[in-house]
Curated annotation (Swiss-Prot):
The gene is truD. Substrate binds at F27, N129, F329. One of its GO terms (biological process) is tRNA pseudouridine synthesis. InterPro entries: PsdUridine_synth_cat_dom_sf, PsdUridine_synth_TruD, PsdUridine_synth_TruD_CS, PsdUridine_synth_TruD_insert, TruD_catalytic, TruD_insert_sf, TruD_pseudoU_synthase. One of its GO terms (molecular function) is RNA binding. It is an enzyme of class 5 (isomerase). It comes from Klebsiella pneumoniae (strain 342). It comes from the Bacteria. The active site is at D80. It catalyses: uridine(13) in tRNA = pseudouridine(13) in tRNA. The keyword Lyase does not apply. The keyword Isomerase applies. This is tRNA pseudouridine synthase D.
Length: 349
């Protein structure tokens, strides 16, 4: 299995070193749900600014304040403890008066707004995240500047970030141990983390190998192409290659790679053969995903940071601003800019 720090770079390995997350304020994440609260319903959406608190900890504290069970508080995505993050929590409080959440107090947290909502906020039910990232102690400003311009034009590989695999790769190691054992894993959190790490590693490996072997954004026969900004996709035929290539170049379509699991992977012919060959040696992880009935899916291989801008504070410090769709990782952008020093495995998704 290819380690995260050895995955192929789209723009070549960075020449510059740099410091990521010198302090929590250097990494700001603002969650974008893509919708506003309904203003009525049995749930309450709460927008919280937090620093030094992980999402589950805040959710449990909110449940305690409202005197409801912890499972009645949900969120769209996990946000890291070691960052400044703004996100929504959702509490189910039916048949009750509107709680006064201005009285909710937790060190490092501030309630920004709250309102009634008709539906539960479910995991993954967000549009994306707005990031502000400050990189410090940059050793080669011009190399970073050139790479930023290239990223604006060509994007970055849509790798799952190191945080998906746990500190020291613990989630992936757990998946590998589980794959080699017949013993069931009953802890729901461990199951979720380990299966996610397994599938993410297999995806990353496909992308890395394709990037190394071929022109990364070249459509091949049988590729599954995704409509930009949407989850639907179709398989390209030989007759459609030329037209599809033009649409990929214009960012109307995105080439995808497999998120392996049970069922049809989605690609066909040359593309399917290449995907299977890329992870052919990872038989135990593939078998685990099938055994646990994780359904196969697709994910775009390229990621284009939207609204990308940057501002050099001085020759060694740059502030980046960009928006990423849900499920994408800011670390996949940063790794194309600098060889990082800092907390890579504990960054918010």
């Amino acid at each position: 299995m290819i380690a995260f720090d050895q995955l192929t770079w789209l723009h070549g390995k960075p020449q510059s070193s740099g410091l990521l997350k010198a302090n929590p304020e250097d990494f700001l994440v603002v969650e974008d749900l893509g919708f506003a609260p309904d203003g009525e319903g049995e749930h309450v959406l709460v927008r919280i600014l937090k620093n030094g608190c992980n999402t589950r900890f805040v959710a449990d504290a909110l449940a305690k304040f409202l005197k409801i069970h912890a499972r009645e508080v949900s969120f769209a995505g996990q946000k890291d403890k070691h960052a400044v993050t703004e996100q929504w929590l959702c509490a189910r409080v039916p048949g009750k008066e509107m709680p006064d959440l201005s009285k909710f107090q937790l060190e490092g947290c501030q309630v920004l707004e709250y309102a009634r909502h008709k539906r539960k906020l479910r995991l993954g039910a967000l549009k994306g995240n707005q990031f502000t990232v400050i990189l410090r102690e940059i050793s080669h400003r011009q190399d970073v500047e050139t790479r930023l311009q290239a990223i604006a034009e060509r994007g970055v590989p849509n790798y799952f970030g190191a945080q998906r695999f746990g500190i020291g790769g613990s989630n992936l190691q757990g998946a590998l141990r589980w794959a080699e054992s017949d013993a069931p894993v009953r802890d729901r959190n461990k199951r979720s983390f380990w299966l996610s790490a397994a599938r993410s590693a297999l995806f990353n490996q496909q992308v890395s190998i394709r990037l190394k072997k071929t022109e990364f954004n070249q459509v091949v026969d049988g590729d599954a192409l995704q409509l930009a900004g949407r989850g639907s996709w179709f398989v390209v035929t030989p007759e459609e290659l030329e037209v599809s290539q033009a649409r990929v170049h214009n960012r109307e379509l995105m080439i995808t790679a497999a998120l392996p699991g049970s069922g049809d992977w989605g690609s066909q012919r040359d593309a399917l053969a290449a995907e299977q060959a890329a992870i052919a040696e990872e038989t135990s992880l593939q078998a685990l995903l099938v055994r646990e009935k994780v359904e196969a899916a697709r994910r775009a291989m390229l990621l284009y940071p939207q609204q990308l801008s940057w501002n050099w504070w001085d020759d060694v410090t740059v502030e980046l601003r960009f928006w990423l769709p849900a499920g994408s990782f800011a670390t996949s952008v940063v790794r194309e800019l600098i060889n990082t020093t800092g907390d890579y495995a504990n960054i918010a998704e």
